[in-house]
Design a protein with these regions (language model features):
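Ser/Thr-glycine-rich phosphate-binding loops at phosphate-binding pockets of nucleotides
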Residues: 203, 207-208
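Cys-dependent protein tyrosine phosphatase-like superfamily
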Residues: 1-2, 6-198, 211-309
Length: 309
């Protein structure tokens, strides 16, 4: 392709004036470098090609010290609506507990208002809660098996292939046993005053992965893109830092721990197959199991989707 690409940036994804570009490059270069001087600020960019075609982009991962796997769920296309998920509205992450002041400032800088914590009461014990200033809503989804699995791995009683089957079973149970909890999450998201929202559990992979998949599905994002989003946890969750004790375990046990913290396609597919077996498809599940009306789904889409530029 020939021509020029202009880049404009702003902290507000809904208001990026095209007055003074921060960078201009030949489209044929297929790349450009933009240096930001303040790492605590998050920027969104509009790329304008030949003064005609526009696309809004941002980094998906948000680097906040003390929080793993923190990422923006914006930008994904919703083909049925011909729209995209809004940037800067909906985030997902691993556990959020007490943070240093600069990390809290970064959360404030991206505007986080509501934090949905999916961890169980037993998981919260021993963790110092996040300081005041955020609306933290607990929607506990218990994965009792997880603690037993980790204990079994440490005692070298459970192997990697056994863990694989257990996580698949756990994901099937997640979509069948927690309809009320998912309904509560959707109720929070249906209130436009709660945004921006971040959803998290312990690793930001299992329960958060299922919840995020259901939300994206309700917005009309297709299954391939939902899987792509799910698998990003493999890039942004640091397993060694979450399981430092594993260094003292034999290789087989380390492999089992890697399995339990990984976002494998089979794990999300297990949940999807269970939904399809019981309800036929995800849309029917959202309506019959979770109780979302078509009007509520349209309302959620009006909040979280935006027209393509």
């Amino acid at each position: 392709s020939r021509g020029l690409g202009d880049v404009y940036k702003r902290q507000d994804p809904n208001n990026i004036p095209e007055d003074s570009p921060v960078a201009i490059a030949n489209i044929s270069d297929q790349r450009m470098t933009i240096v930001t001087t303040d790492p605590t600020k998050r920027y969104y960019y509009t790329l304008v090609f030949n003064d005609k075609y526009r696309v809004k982009i941002a980094t998906r991962n948000v680097n906040i010290p003390g929080i793993q796997n923190f990422r923006d769920m914006g930008g994904y296309p919703s083909y049925p609506t011909k729209k995209r998920v809004r940037w800067g509205m909906l985030y997902r992450s691993a556990q959020i507990d007490s943070l240093e002041c600069y990390s809290r400032r970064e959360l404030k800088n991206i505007g986080i208002k509501t934090i949905i914590d999916l961890r169980s009461e037993s998981e919260l014990r021993g963790h110092t809660p996040l300081q005041q200033g955020f609306n933290v809503i607990h929607v506990p989804i218990k994965t009792g098996d997880m603690e037993d699995i980790l204990k079994g791995i440490q005692e070298q009683k459970i192997k990697s292939d056994t863990v694989y089957r257990m996580v698949e079973r756990m994901n099937r149970e997640l979509v069948m046993n927690y309809h009320k909890e998912y309904r509560q999450i959707f109720d929070i998201l249906l209130n436009s005053t709660n945004y921006p929202v971040v959803i998290h559990c312990s690793s930001g992979k299992g329960r958060t992965g299922i919840a995020s998949a259901l939300i994206l599905a309700s917005l009309g994002v297709n299954s391939d893109i939902i899987m792509e989003d799910y698998r990003l946890s493999n890039d942004y969750f640091n397993i060694p830092s979450a399981s430092s004790y594993a260094y003292n375990l034999p290789a087989r046990s380390q492999e089992a721990i890697t399995t339990i913290y990984s976002a494998r396609e089979d794990f999300l597919n297990a949940a999807k197959e269970e939904i399809e077996r019981r309800y036929g498809d995800v849309d029917t599940y959202l309506q019959r199991a979770i109780g979302l009306t078509k009007e509520e789904i349209k309302k959620l889409q009006s909040i979280l989707l935006v027209k393509n530029d």
